[in-house]
Every structure is written in structure tokens, then in C-alpha cells.
């Protein structure tokens, strides 16, 4: 590679490293901007969602006061339509401890013997050969994983879609800015209207396809992350 092309190849990498963490020029010296209201409402229906069977419609007969939005006679109205709001109770307290150990031994030995004898014009040559070969492998592996996670909070979510079978698609976000750091919480998934309690609250373990994200952005996050240029070098470095 020509030495003249090297600066041209390094220039885009340098520009990329200077724009790490999507920091804009407006945020230099200022607190990071918060997202507009409503930007956290995400709804992207996959083809698999359209395969659910349609929910049969329950028509009130006579003077019936039954309503599917309640699901019980003595409960308050719960979120059922697009745009309704419900509260998600997140209480994650997970612990995992794995200790795996593997040992593998293998020994293989083989041999080959052959003998040849012939008579040519009164001369009898004799050939004898022996070949032996073998292999021996030994593999030992040990792995251990230990982690503990705890997250407790309440967040409001909005019904952004309704599946054919009546299940609700919810999406919600919450942003809290303290000084120059923003903490961002995103939650989304599919819930059954029957799982929403009388207080219009649903627990996180009853959310199917749950996507819960708790992170942040700001000055502290930028310092903790390595530069983009270093990440690219670490990704493609053979050593």
C-alpha cells in the first residue's frame, strides 16, 4: 500500500472517532437534550403478529352490563384501546451462578506390518517393514459465570397497537436528567388485558416479548466508553 494513501484512509477514522457517542456541537458545554414527548412510542408490527387468530366479538344481549374492558364485575376500567395508559411494575432481582468444567482425553494407536519375499534368478530378496503411529489429545476447560441484577421502579406505558386476538402492544419510556447525565428507561412488549389488575398495573413478568432497557447518555457515559476509533481497531485487530 502506498504511503500517500495512508493519510486518506486514516482521515475518515479520525473524523469518526471525533464524533463518538453522537455528541453534537450544541451539547458541548451544555446538558444533553431530552427527547421530544411521544418519541418513545414505538410500534413495528412483524409478520408473525398478523398470524394470530382474530378474537371473536362478544355482543351484549338483552340488558347485559358486561364489558370486556373490566374482565370482572367489581373492577375499575383498565387499558384496552390504543392510546390508553397503564403502569408497568418492574421488580427485577435476578441472580445466576454457573460453574462448568469439561475434561476430554483421547488416545489412538495404530500399526502396519508387511513382508515381501521373491526369487529372481536364484536370488531371493527379502523385505520386511513395520510402521507404527499414534495420537494423544487432552482437553480441559473450565468456566464460571456469576451475576446479580436488581431493578425496581414503576413506569407508565401507552397502548400502541392491538393484535388480532385482542392482546395489547405497549411501549413506554422515561427520561430523567440529573446535571449533565440522562437516565433513559424503555419498556415494551405484548400483554393480555386480563393480566392488568384493578389499579391498571401490570407486572413485568406478565409481559410477553418484553424489551426492558435501562441506560443513559451524557458526560459520564462518554467518559466510560472508549473512543470509536479504538473500538474499530479492537474489532479488526488480529492480536
Curated annotation (Swiss-Prot):
Residues bearing a lipid moiety (S-diacylglycerol cysteine): 19
Quaternary data: The basal body constitutes a major portion of the flagellar organelle and consists of four rings (L,P,S, and M) mounted on a central rod.
Physiological role: Assembles around the rod to form the L-ring and probably protects the motor/basal body from shearing forces during rotation.
Organism listed in the record: Agrobacterium fabrum (strain C58 / ATCC 33970)
Domain of life from the UniProt record: Bacteria
Signal peptide location: 1-18
Topology with respect to the bilayer: Lipid-anchor
Keyword field contains Cell wall biogenesis/degradation: no
Xref: InterPro entries: Flag_Lring
Record's protein name: Flagellar L-ring protein
Any single Gene Ontology cellular-component annotation: bacterial-type flagellum basal body, distal rod, L ring
Single GO term (MF): cytoskeletal motor activity
Main location: membrane
A Pfam entry, by short name: FlgH
Swiss-Prot/TrEMBL GO biological process terms: bacterial-type flagellum-dependent cell motility
Amino acid at each position: 500500500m502506498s504511503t500517500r494513501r495512508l493519510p486518506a484512509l486514516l482521515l475518515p477514522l479520525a473524523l469518526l472517532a471525533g464524533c463518538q457517542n453522537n455528541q453534537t456541537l450544541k451539547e458541548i458545554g451544555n446538558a444533553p437534550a431530552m427527547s421530544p414527548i411521544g418519541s418513545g412510542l414505538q410500534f413495528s408490527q412483524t409478520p408473525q403478529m398478523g398470524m394470530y387468530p382474530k378474537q371473536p366479538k362478544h355482543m351484549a344481549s338483552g340488558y347485559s352490563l358486561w364489558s370486556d374492558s373490566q374482565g370482572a364485575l367489581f373492577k375499575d376500567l383498565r387499558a384496552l384501546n390504543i392510546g390508553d395508559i397503564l403502569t408497568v411494575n418492574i421488580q427485577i432481582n435476578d441472580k445466576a451462578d454457573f460453574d462448568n468444567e469439561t475434561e476430554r482425553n483421547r488416545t489412538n494407536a495404530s500399526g502396519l506390518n508387511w513382508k515381501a519375499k521373491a526369487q529372481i534368478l536364484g536370488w531371493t530378496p527379502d523385505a520386511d517393514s513395520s510402521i507404527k503411529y499414534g495420537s494423544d489429545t487432552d482437553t480441559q476447560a473450565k468456566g464460571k459465570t456469576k451475576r446479580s441484577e436488581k431493578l425496581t421502579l414503576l413506569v407508565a406505558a401507552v397502548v400502541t397497537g392491538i393484535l388480532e386476538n385482542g392482546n395489547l402492544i405497549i411501549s413506554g419510556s422515561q427520561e430523567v436528567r440529573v446535571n449533565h447525565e440522562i437516565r433513559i428507561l424503555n419498556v415494551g412488549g405484548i400483554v393480555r388485558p386480563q393480566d392488568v389488575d384493578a389499579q391498571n398495573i401490570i407486572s413485568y413478568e406478565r409481559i410477553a416479548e418484553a424489551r426492558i432497557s435501562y441506560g443513559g447518555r451524557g458526560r459520564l457515559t462518554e467518559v466510560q466508553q472508549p473512543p470509536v476509533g479504538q473500538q474499530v481497531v479492537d474489532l479488526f485487530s488480529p492480536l
